[in-house]
């Protein structure tokens, strides 16, 4: 484990990054990442939650996003993703925000869909018995979230932490109730399932 960083320092590094995570959620991710050496995040946006996890871990965060927007993002007429340059703007900002972590070898961006990333990482994760932590915050519609959850839950270590954001979204809550009914509530809208998932 690395030396603990003060809460205000974690927040000072994360909060300038555009995103939807509250302070208590960011600090929770930081604390969980301190226990993990291989983390996968699905749904990066501009890297706010990614930064919290990179600050906590001594290992690597695989940051998965295709930066094409989720169905709910694309349905929002006021979204940056509706502009012709939306994808490149958001992805460029994410890379700028994560550059220090990338340079340190703590963050590996995977610019691909969740499904492709799961297939790509499967042999890497199988060799080590699964990921220590997987954080799902990609698309929140029922079909997309079900696909993500079913794909990624196969790749978590038997003692790993499977968690995500926005448990109050109808698609997320419906799928969690169906697939992982023993999911616990974390701070804010964090959900988690801790170990014994296989």
Where does each model-flagged region fall?
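S-adenosylmethionine/decaboxylated-SAM
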Residues: 4, 9-18, 26-198
């Amino acid at each position: 484990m690395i030396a603990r960083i003060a809460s205000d320092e974690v927040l000072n590094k994360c909060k300038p990054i555009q995103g939807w995570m509250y302070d208590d959620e960011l600090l929770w991710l930081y604390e969980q990442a301190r226990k993990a050496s291989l983390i996968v995040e699905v749904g990066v946006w501009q890297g706010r939650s990614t930064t919290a996890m990179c600050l906590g871990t001594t290992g690597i965060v695989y940051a998965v996003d295709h930066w094409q927007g989720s169905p709910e993002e694309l349905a929002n007429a006021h979204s940056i993703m509706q502009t012709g340059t939306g994808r490149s703007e958001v992805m460029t900002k994410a890379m700028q925000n994560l550059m220090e972590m990338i340079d340190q070898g703590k963050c590996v961006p995977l610019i691909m869909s969740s499904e492709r990333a799961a297939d790509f990482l499967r042999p890497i994760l199988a060799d080590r018995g699964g990921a220590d932590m997987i954080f799902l915050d990609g698309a929140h519609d029922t079909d997309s979230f079900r696909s993500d959850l079913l794909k990624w839950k196969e790749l978590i270590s038997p003692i790993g932490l499977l968690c995500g954001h926005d448990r109050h979204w109808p698609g997320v809550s419906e799928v969690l109730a169906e697939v992982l009914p023993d999911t616990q509530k974390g701070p804010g809208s964090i959900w988690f399932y801790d170990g014994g998932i296989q």
